Swiss-Prot record:
Biased composition (Gly residues): 13-27
NCBIfam families linked: rpsE_bact
Any one GO molecular-function label of the UniProt entry: rRNA binding
Gene3D superfamilies referenced in this protein's UniProt entry, alphabetically: 3.30.160.20, 3.30.230.10
Identification of the protein by name: Small ribosomal subunit protein uS5
Any GO CC annotation of this UniProt entry: small ribosomal subunit
Organism: Rubrobacter xylanophilus (strain DSM 9941 / JCM 11954 / NBRC 16129 / PRD-1)
Record note on domains: The N-terminal domain interacts with the head of the 30S subunit; the C-terminal domain interacts with the body and contacts protein S4. The interaction surface between S4 and S5 is involved in control of translational fidelity.
Function, as annotated: With S4 and S12 plays an important role in translational accuracy. Located at the back of the 30S subunit body where it stabilizes the conformation of the head with respect to the body.
Region feature Disordered, mapped onto this chain: 1-49
Feature: compositional bias, Polar residues: 1-12
């Protein structure tokens, strides 16, 4: 009898992080849910999931010649109102993803919600990109694409309308979405700031 063979998922590094397509796009391999999110660590009883939005290959010209590095844009969230975005850079794809995950976890913040949607309309901005986020009725779903969808879904938002304005660079759109979510306030918070009753 021969020795049993063990297999390793292609693109997976020794740390368990998976490699992506160096030309960009979504993440690849390892156990994921139906929408491509990957189970991760637990934070206060909630499971943190992550999604690799983009992997880019960057060439630096030095005295010894060209040196290749990779950058990975990663979104993490618990699906219950907390989300974070991180950009990791390293000389290998798995290392870049791991750094992106770590930065995203440290950058997690709370997202105010009203049932399954956001409490009010908001426009997030980052450099030349803007993302309009509008509340939607239950059952609408997340009307968004690419990185914008990843941020909203991992935050736990199930019904929302979005529109991308300006630059459609993945990094800019993700950061603009993050900015929009950071601007959200609950009804109680708005009333406290304004000192008057409001209707949302």
């Amino acid at each position: 009898m021969g020795r049993p063979r063990t297999s390793q998922t292609r693109g997976q590094g020794p740390s368990g992080a998976t490699g992506g397509n160096p030309r960009g796009g979504g993440s690849t391999t390892r156990e994921r849910d139906a929408r491509g999110a990957r189970p991760g660590e637990r934070d206060g009883g909630s499971e943190i999931q992550d999604r690799v939005v983009q992997i880019r290959r960057v060439a630096k010209v030095k005295k010894g010649g060209r040196r290749l590095n990779f950058s990975a844009l990663v979104v993490v969230g618990d699906g219950q109102g907390r989300v974070g975005v991180g950009l990791g850079k390293a000389n290998t794809v798995p290392a870049a993803i791991a750094k992106g995950q770590e930065k995203a976890r440290h950058a997690m913040f709370d997202v105010p919600m009203r049932n399954t949607t956001i409490p009010h309309e908001v426009v997030g901005e980052y450099e030349s990109s803007r993302v309009l986020l509008k509340p939607a009725s239950e059952g609408t779903g997340v009307i968004a694409g690419g990185g914008v969808r990843a941020v909203l879904e991992l935050a736990g938002i199930k019904d929302v309308l979005t529109k991308a304005l300006g630059s459609t660079t993945p990094v800019n759109l993700v950061r603009a979405t993050e900015d929009g979510l950071r601007q959200l306030r609950t009804k109680a918070q708005i009333e406290q700031i304004r000192g008057v009753k409001v209707r949302l």
